[in-house]
Curated annotation (Swiss-Prot):
It comes from Arabidopsis thaliana (Mouse-ear cress). ATP binds at I954, G955, S956, G957, G958, S959, G960, K961, V962, K976. Its EC number is 2.7.11.1. Belongs to the protein kinase superfamily. Ser/Thr protein kinase family. Its main location: membrane. It is an enzyme of class 2 (transferase). Residues 948-1232 form the Protein kinase domain. One of its GO terms (biological process) is regulation of root morphogenesis. The gene is GSO2. This is LRR receptor-like serine/threonine-protein kinase GSO2.
Length: 1252
C-alpha cells in the first residue's frame, strides 16, 4: 500500500514536471499577446476593451478575440473594438495563427513585415478600415496559404506588390479605397482560385492586363474610380463565373468588346464614366442573367437595340449621358416585366414617348430628361403605378398634364421643368400623397394653383417658377408641414399671401417675386424661423412689416424691392447672417437700423428709393465684406461716416439724391476696389479731394448737383479706367486740364453749369470711346472749338452751348455720322455753316450773331451798305469771264475723267502680285506660296470678285474689307483690301514684315498666303486662306437680318476657347520676335469647315501702324476694339502681351455667355467683366448664376456646366485690372487645356455593396 502511494506521488510529480516543461511555449504566447496589447493605445476615458488581457489571467484562450486550437493560438479577431495605436511586429511570432482580423479600428503605422513569418499557417488577414500607412510589404507574397486578404480603406500608398502573384490559394483580395498607384500586376493571372478582386477607389493606372482572363474562378471584379486606361481586354470573356464587373469612372477608351457577351454568369456590369465609344454591342442583349447594366457617361453612339427591351431579368438600365440617337421604340418592355430603373437622360433621344411605355409595369424610376423629346406625355405613362421618381425635364414636350397623374400614388420626385406644357395643373395631383419634390418651372401652365396641393402632405419642394399661373396662392399650402422650398416667381398670381404659410415651419426658401400680389406680409411668417431666403420683389405688397419678422434669425438673403411697403425695416434686423439685403423702391421711413451692421458678411446692401431720414449708421463700418452700398434717393443728412472707410471691399457706393453735407471724405481714395462713386444731388462743399484721383479702378464718378468749388486738378488723368464722369451743376472754376485726354475709356463726360474757363483742350480728341455725351455747356470757355472733337467716332451728343467760344464751326463736326444731338447756341461763333449742318434745327446755333447759313438765315452776299455798287459794264465783264472759266473747267474735268479711267484700267490689268507669273513688274514674290494650289494672279482675283464688288464682301473692320474669291482652279481664298494710300510693295520694311508673317504656321492661326498690289490707291491686297464658317461673332450674335447659323454647342465652344488661347500663346512665345496682336475680338476668331478656331489679323497692327506711316486714322484703327481693350492701354498707349490676354478674356466671356461686351445691359455702372464677376459670386445653382450661360446652350450636362463656370473663372483672371495679376497666354492656355481634359464627370454611382 505504501509502495502504491509512492508510485502515485512519483506519477503526479512526473506529470507536474511534464506540464512544467511545456510552460515556456505558452509563456511566449502570453508575453506576445501582452506586447501586442501594449502597442495599442487605450483611451483612459473609454472602457478598456482588452482588460482581460493581463498576466493575472493566464488562460489567454479565454481572452477577448483570442481563438485557440488545443493550447495553440490560431485566431485573433479584434475587429471593431475602437483600437488605436499600431500593430506590434511581435504578431509574427504566433507560429500557428490561421486567422487575423484587426479591421474597423483606428490603427496607424505600417503593416508589419513580420507577418511573413506566418507563411505556413495564415489563411486570412483582415486589416481593412484602419489608418494604416506606407507601402504594402512585398513580403506578404510569401503567405502561400492565404485565402483571404483584405487591406482596403487605409492610407496605404505605393504599388500592388508583384509578389501577390505567388498567393496561388487566394480566393479574396480587397485593396479598395487606399492610395495605391501603378499598374495592376499581370502576375494576378496566376491566381486561378481568386473569386473576389476589389481594387476600386485608388489611383491605379494603365490597362487591365489580359492575364486577368486566366482567373477563371473570379465572381466579382471591381476596379472603379481609378485612372485605368486603354481598351477593355477581350480576354475578360474567359471569366465564365463572373457575376459582377465594375470598371466605372476610369479612362478606358475604344469600343466595348463584343466578347463581353460571353460572360454567361454576369449579373452586374458597370462601365460608367469612361471614354468608350462606338456602338453598344448587340451581344450584351444575350446576357440572360444580367440585372444591372450601366454604360452612362461615355461617348457611345447609335441606337438602343430593341433586344434590350426583351431582357426579362434586367432591372437597372443606365445609358444616360451618351451620344445615342433615335427614339424610344414601341417594343419597349415587350418582354421585360422586371425593369425597375431606366436612366436615358442626355442621350439625344428624339421623337415622342410611346404609349407602349406602360408595358414597363415594374418601373420605379424613369429618367428621360435632357433630351429632345416632343409631343404629349402619353396617358399610358401614368399607368406605371410603381413609379417613385419621374424625370421628364429639359425636353420639348407639349400639351397638357393629364389628370391620370392621380394613378401615381407612390411618386416621390416629379420634374417637368423646361418644356412647353400648358393648360392647368390638374387638381388630381392631390392624390400624390407621397410626393416630396415637384418641379414644373419654365413651362406655360396657366390657371389657378389647385387647392388640392394641400393634400400632398409630404411635399418638401415646390418650384413652379416662370409659368402663367393666375389667381391666389391657395391657403391649403399651409398644410404642408415638411415644405422647405416654395418658388412661384414670374407668374401672374394676385391677392394676399396666405397667412397659413406660417405653418410651414421647415421653410428655408420663399420666392414669390415678379407677380401681382397685394396686401401685407402675414404676421404668422414670424414662425418661419428656419427661413434663409425671402424674395417678394416686384409685387404690389404694402403696409408695415409685422414685428414678428424679428424672429427670423437665419435670414441670409432678402429682396423686398419694388413694392409699396412703409414704416420701419427694424423687424428685418433680427438676423446677423445677411449676405444680401434689398428693400429698394418702397416707402420705408425713419432711421436706418444700427443692427444692420451686425451682419459682417453682408455683401450687398440696397436701401435706395425710400424715405429714410437721419444719418448713415456708423455701424456700417463693421460690415467687413460689404461691396455694394446703395442708399440713394432718400432724405438722409449729415456727413458720410468715417467708419465706412473700414469697408475695404467696397466696389459700389451710391448716395445720390440725399441731403448729405460736409466735404467729400479723403479716405474714399483709400478704397482699393472702388469702381463706382455716386454722390450726386447732395449738399457737399469744398474742393475735389486729390485723394479720389488715386482710384485707378474707378469706372463711374458722379459728383454733380453739389456746391463743390475750386478747380479740376491735373491728377484727373490718373483715373485710367473711368467710363463716366459727371461734375455738372457745381461751382468749379479754372481751366479744364489737358490730362482729361488720358481718360481714353471715357464713355460719358458732363461738366456743364460750372464756371470753367480757358480754351477747350485739343486733347479731348483723344477720348476715342466717348459716346453717350460730351457736355461742356453753361461755362465760360473761350477760344475756338477744337477740330479734334470731330475725330470722336462714336460721339452721339455734343453740347457746347452758353460759353464764349469764337471763330468758325469746324466743318468736320458736321460730318460726324454718330452725332445725333448738337447744341452750339449762345456763343460768339461766326462764319458760314457748311451744308453738313443743315440736318440740325436752328436752335442748335442761335445766339451766335456772326453765324449764318442753313439752318440759320442765308449769309448776306452783298458787301457793306457803304460799299460802292458795281457798274453794269463791270458786271458784264465779270459774267463773261465767269462763263468762260466754267466752260474751261468742264472741259478739264472731262479730260481728267477719261485719262484717270484709262490709267486705272491699265494699272488694274497690269497690277503687281506676290504670286503673279506675268506681273508687269520684275519684283520677286514676297514669300513662297503658302498653301495655294497654284500661283494666284491679280486678274484672277479681280475676275472672281468682279473687281472687289460689295456682293463678294464677307467682312470689314478697322484694317479693311475682306472679300471671298472663288478662283478658276477651284480654290477659295479670302482677300483683304487694306485701307492705304501708298504702294506698300515698294516699302522694304513692309515687305520684310509681310514675309515674316507669311512664314508663320499654326493650327489656330489664319495663314497669310501672299500679297498683291495694283499700284492704285486703295488696292493693296493681303491673301489669306478662306474660313468657310465665318467668325465666332457671326455664330453668337446673328440677328433677324443675318442668316442664322446653327447653335454652337458647348463642346465646340470649349474647343474654340482652347484654340484661341493656343493661337495667342504661339504668337507670344513661338514667334521671334514675339507678336502682340492688339485687336483680339470675336470677329477676328474665324472658323474653318470643321468649326475649328483660327485667329486672324495678327501682325497687321505693326505692319500698318508701327513704322511706315504716321496716318492718325490707321494708328487708332488698329489699337483695339471697343469693349475688348485692356484698361491700361488708355494711359500707356502701349499694347503688350498682357493686353492681348485681357482681350482674350473678354472673348472667353462672350463664348460662354453669348453676350456682346457692348450690349445695352452693360452701361456706365456695370461692364461685362464686373457683371460676370458679380453673378459668378452668387450661390451655385441660383438662377442668376445659370443666366451667365448662353440660353442657346439648353440642357448642359452638370460636368459641362461646371466647365463653363471654370472658363469664366479663367476669363476673370485674364481681365484683372492690373496687367501683372493676369496670367500669361501660356498659363491661360494650360488652364483651358486642363478644363478640356477634365470635362468628363460621373453621372450616378451604381455600385454593389462589397467588402473592402
Amino acid at each position: 500500500m505504501q509502495q502504491n502511494s509512492v508510485l502515485l506521488a512519483l506519477f503526479f510529480l512526473c506529470f507536474s514536471s511534464g506540464l512544467g516543461s511545456g510552460q515556456p511555449g505558452q509563456r511566449d504566447d502570453l508575453q506576445t499577446l501582452l506586447e501586442l496589447k501594449n502597442s495599442f493605445i487605450t483611451n483612459p476615458k473609454e472602457e478598456d476593451v482588452l482588460r482581460d488581457w493581463n498576466s493575472g489571467s493566464p488562460s489567454y484562450c479565454n481572452w477577448t478575440g483570442v481563438t485557440c486550437g488545443g493550447r495553440e493560438i490560431i485566431g485573433l479577431n479584434l475587429s471593431g473594438l475602437g483600437l488605436t495605436g499600431s500593430i506590434s511586429p511581435s504578431i509574427g511570432r504566433f507560429n500557428n495563427l490561421i486567422h487575423i482580423d484587426l479591421s474597423s479600428n483606428r490603427l496607424v503605422g505600417p503593416i508589419p513585415t513580420t507577418l511573413s513569418n506566418l507563411s505556413s499557417s495564415l489563411e486570412s488577414l483582415h486589416l481593412f478600415s484602419n489608418l494604416l500607412s506606407g507601402d504594402i510589404p512585398s513580403q506578404l507574397g510569401s503567405l502561400v496559404n492565404l485565402k483571404s486578404l483584405k487591406l482596403g480603406d487605409n492610407e496605404l500608398n505605393g504599388t500592388i506588390p508583384e509578389t501577390f502573384g505567388n498567393l496561388v490559394n487566394l480566393q479574396m483580395l480587397a485593396l479598395a479605397s487606399c492610395r495605391l498607384t501603378g499598374l495592376i500586376p499581370s502576375r494576378f493571372g496566376r491566381l486561378v482560385q481568386l473569386q473576389t478582386l476589389i481594387l476600386q477607389d485608388n489611383e491605379l493606372e494603365g490597362p487591365i492586363p489580359a492575364e486577368i482572363g486566366n482567373c477563371t474562378s473570379l465572381a466579382l471584379f471591381a476596379a472603379a474610380f481609378n485612372r485605368l486606361n486603354g481598351s477593355l481586354p477581350a480576354e475578360l470573356n474567359r471569366l465564365k463565373n463572373l457575376q459582377t464587373l465594375n470598371l466605372g469612372d476610369n479612362s478606358f477608351s475604344g469600343e466595348i468588346p463584343s466578347q463581353l457577351g460571353d460572360l454567361v454568369s454576369i449579373q452586374y456590369l458597370n462601365l460608367i464614366g469612361n471614354q468608350l465609344q462606338g456602338l453598344i454591342p448587340k451581344r450584351l442583349t444575350e446576357l440572360a442573367n444580367l440585372q444591372t447594366l450601366d454604360l452612362s457617361s461615355n461617348n457611345l453612339t447609335g441606337v438602343i437595340h430593341e433586344e434590350f427591351w426583351r431582357m426579362n431579368q434586367l432591372e437597372f438600365l443606365v445609358l444616360a449621358k451618351n451620344r445615342l440617337s433615335g427614339s424610344l421604340p414601341k417594343t419597349i418592355c415587350s418582354n421585360n416585366t422586371s425593369l425597375k430603373q431606366l436612366f436615358l437622360s442626355e442621350t439625344q433621344l428624339s421623337g415622342e414617348i410611346p404609349a407602349e411605355i406602360s408595358n414597363c409595369q415594374s418601373l420605379k424610376l424613369l429618367d428621360l430628361s435632357n433630351n429632345t423629346l416632343t409631343g404629349q406625355i402619353p396617358d399610358s405613362l401614368f399607368q406605371l403605378v410603381e413609379l417613385t421618381n419621374l424625370y421628364l425635364n429639359n425636353n420639348s414636350l407639349e400639351g397638357t398634364l393629364s389628370s391620370s397623374i392621380s394613378n401615381l400614388t407612390n411618386l416621390q420626385e416629379f420634374t417637368l421643368y423646361h418644356n412647353n406644357l400648358e393648360g392647368k395643373v390638374p387638381k388630381e395631383i392631390g392624390f400624390l400623397g407621397k410626393l416630396e419634390i415637384m418641379y414644373l418651372y419654365e413651362n406655360r401652365f396657366s390657371g389657378e394653383m389647385p387647392v388640392e396641393i394641400g393634400n400632398c402632405t409630404r411635399l418638401q419642394e415646390i418650384d413652379w417658377y416662370g409659368n402663367r399661373l393666375s389667381g391666389e396662392i391657395p391657403s391649403s399650402i399651409g398644410r404642408l408641414k415638411d415644405l422647405t422650398r416654395l418658388h412661384l416667381r414670374e407668374n401672374e398670381l394676385v391677392g394676399n399671401i396666405p397667412a397659413s404659410l406660417g405653418n410651414c415651419h421647415q421653410m428655408t426658401v420663399i420666392d414669390l417675386a415678379d407677380n401681382q400680389l397685394s396686401g401685407s406680409i402675414p404676421s404668422s411668417f414670424g414662425f418661419l424661423t428656419a427661413l434663409e431666403l425671402f424674395m417678394i420683389y416686384n409685387n404690389s405688397l404694402q403696409g408695415n412689416l409685422p414685428d414678428s419678422l424679428i424672429n427670423l434669425k437665419n435670414l441670409t438673403r432678402i429682396n423686398f424691392s419694388s413694392n409699396k411697403f412703409n414704416g420701419s425695416i427694424s423687424p428685418l434686423c433680427g438676423s446677423s447672417s445677411y449676405l444680401s439685403f434689398d428693400v429698394t423702391e418702397n416707402g420705408f421711413e425713419g432711421d436706418i437700423p444700427l443692427e444692420l451692421g451686425k451682419s459682417t458678411n453682408l455683401d450687398r446692401l440696397r436701401l435706395g428709393k425710400n424715405q429714410f431720414t437721419g444719418r448713415i449708421p456708423r455701424t456700417f463700418g463693421k460690415i467687413s465684406e460689404l461691396s455694394l452700398l446703395d442708399i440713394s434717393r432718400n432724405s438722409l443728412s449729415g456727413i458720410i461716416p468715417v467708419e465706412l472707410g473700414l469697408c475695404k471691399k467696397l466696389t459700389h457706393i451710391d448716395l445720390n439724391n440725399n441731403y448729405l453735407s460736409g466735404v467729400i471724405p479723403t479716405w474714399l481714395g483709400k478704397l482699393p476696389l472702388l469702381g463706382e462713386l455716386k454722390l450726386s444731388s447732395n449738399k457737399f462743399v469744398g474742393s475735389l479731394p486729390t485723394e479720389i484721383f488715386s482710384l485707378t479702378n474707378i469706372l463711374t464718378l458722379f459728383l454733380d448737383g453739389n456746391s463743390l468749388n475750386g478747380s479740376i486738378p491735373q491728377e484727373i488723368g490718373n483715373l485710367q479706367a473711368l467710363n463716366a464722369l459727371n461734375l455738372e451743376e457745381n461751382q468749379l472754376s479754372g481751366p479744364l486740364p489737358s490730362t482729361i485726354g488720358k481718360l481714353s475709356k471715357l464713355f460719358e463726360l458732363r461738366l456743364s453749369r460750372n464756371a470753367l474757363t480757358g480754351e477747350i483742350p485739343v486733347e479731348i480728341g483723344q477720348l476715342q470711346d466717348l459716346q453717350s455725351a460730351l457736355d461742356l455747356s453753361y461755362n465760360n470757355f473761350t477760344g475756338r472749338i477744337p477740330s479734334t472733337i470731330s475725330t470722336l467716332p462714336k460721339l452721339e451728343s455734343l453740347d457746347l452751348s452758353h460759353n464764349q467760344l469764337v471763330g468758325e464751326v469746324p466743318g468736320q463736326i458736321g460730318d460726324m455720322k454718330s452725332l445725333g444731338y448738337l447744341n452750339l447756341s449762345y456763343n460768339n461763333l461766326e462764319g458760314k455753316l457748311k451744308k453738313q449742318f443743315s440736318r440740325w434745327q436752328a436752335d442748335a446755333f442761335v445766339g451766335n450773331a456772326g453765324l449764318c447759313g442753313s439752318p440759320l438765315s442765308h449769309c448776306n452776299r452783298a458787301g457793306s451798305k457803304n460799299q460802292r455798287s458795281l457798274s453794269p459794264k463791270t458786271v458784264v465783264i465779270i459774267s463773261a469771264i465767269s462763263s468762260l472759266a466754267a466752260i474751261a473747267l468742264m472741259v478739264l474735268v472731262i479730260i481728267l475723267f477719261f485719262k484717270q479711267n484709262h490709267d486705272l484700267f491699265k494699272k488694274v490689268r497690269g497690277g503687281n502680285s506676290a504670286f503673279s507669273s506675268n506681273s508687269s513688274s520684275s519684283q520677286a514674290p514676297l514669300f513662297s506660296n503658302g498653301g495655294a494650289k497654284s500661283d494666284i494672279k491679280w486678274d484672277d482675283i479681280m475676275e472672281a470678285t468682279h473687281y472687289l464688288n460689295e456682293e463678294f464682301m464677307i467682312g470689314s473692320g478697322g484694317s479693311g474689307k475682306v472679300y471671298k474669291a472663288e478662283l478658276k482652279n477651284g480654290e477659295t481664298i479670302a482677300v483683304k483690301k487694306i485701307l492705304w494710300k501708298d504702294d506698300l510693295m515698294s516699302n522694304k520694311s513692309f515687305n520684310r514684315e509681310v514675309k515674316t508673317l507669311g512664314t508663320i504656321r499654326h493650327r489656330h492661326l489664319v495663314k497669310l498666303m501672299g500679297y498683291c498690289s495694283s499700284k492704285a490707291d486703295g488696292l493693296n491686297l493681303l491673301i489669306y486662306e478662306y474660313m468657310a464658317n465665318g467668325s465666332v461673332w457671326d455664330w453668337l450674335h446673328a440677328n433677324e437680318n443675318t442668316k442664322k447659323k446653327e447653335v454652337l454647342g458647348w463642346e465646340t465652344r470649349l474647343k474654340i476657347a482652347l484654340g484661341l488661347a493656343q493661337g495667342v500663346e504661339y504668337l507670344h512665345y513661338d514667334c521671334v520676335p514675339p507678336i502682340v496682336h492688339r485687336d483680339i475680338k470675336s470677329s477676328n476668331v474665324l472658323l474653318d469647315s470643321n468649326i475649328e478656331a483660327h485667329l486672324g489679323d495678327f501682325g497687321l497692327a505693326k505692319i500698318l501702324t508701327g513704322n511706315y506711316d504716321t496716318n492718325t486714322e490707321s494708328n487708332t484703327m488698329f489699337a483695339g476694339s471697343y469693349g475688348y481693350i485692356a484698361p491700361e492701354y488708355a494711359y500707356s498707349l502701349k499694347a503688350t502681351e498682357k493686353s492681348d490676354v485681357y482681350s482674350m478674356g473678354i472673348v472667353l466671356m462672350e463664348i460662354v455667355t453669348g453676350k456682346m461686351p457692348t450690349e445695352a445691359m452693360f452701361d456706365e455702372e456695370t461692364d461685362m467683366v464686373r457683371w460676370v464677376e458679380t453673378v459668378l459670386d452668387t450661390p451655385p445653382g441660383s438662377e442668376a448664376r445659370e443666366k451667365l450661360i448662353d440660353s442657346e446652350l439648353k440642357s448642359l450636362l452638370p460636368c459641362e456646366e461646371e466647365a463653363a463656370y471654370q472658363v469664366l473663372e479663367i476669363a476673370l483672371q485674364c481681365t484683372k485690372s492690373y496687367p501683372q495679376e493676369r496670367p500669361s497666354s501660356r498659363q491661360a492656355s494650360e488652364y483651358l487645356l486642363n478644363v478640356f481634359n477634365n470635362r468628363a464627370a460621373s453621372y450616378r454611382e451604381m455600385q454593389t455593396d462589397t467588402d473592402k
